[in-house]
């Protein structure tokens, strides 16, 4: 059974209250734009307004059981839906989508990061040959690695790349939607980013993890185009992308907020199918 993420997209302000109750304010919930809840096993998440749950329940249960076949105005995606309901007195739009906690191959497991991973993250992320190639500075302490796990890797679009043989995270893999991407991409597109610890370079691990993430993004999330980029000084990353089906767009990109952002990056793209 799949986890389902529920996101409040917007609250439409109306002057007239919806007259469902004698005193609708007593039944209302405080719902803010961007607020999220996670539904486990198709159950109503704690803190979600009962009035909203009544409307979305059948959609959430269907998605949780892998029975969803919904099409909304934003994404051509059978694993998501956008619905409108109310929090007791005002209409609210919600986006509901399935979330994968784990993905795996014969030798790799992609799972959520844990704070207990901080020490091993630091072991690989403190290497000056790793971070700068991906646009971020080498970690300076275990505490810094712990903060990254809390504030960056806590996203539900980021996974630790774990070698099953050792049970140890050896890298990171994730995707960005059009709202969080470093580059300008379409609403139905995503951007993929990744890195692998230096001791595991040239073993096919990065290619294996990227193919797994591409399968998820194309066949579960149903993105139309998948984008990525790499520094011209890091051609090995480009070869990994080429093996996985990416093609060069003949465009160079610069991201000033990244470490080394003043250097050229090659932009690549993968079409669905």
Task: Set out the residue ranges of the language-model regions.
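A short helix-loop-beta-strand connector motif used in the catalytic cores of GNAT acetyltransferases and
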Residues: 149-160
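Conserved GNAT-fold acetyl-CoA-binding loop/helix
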Residues: 129-150
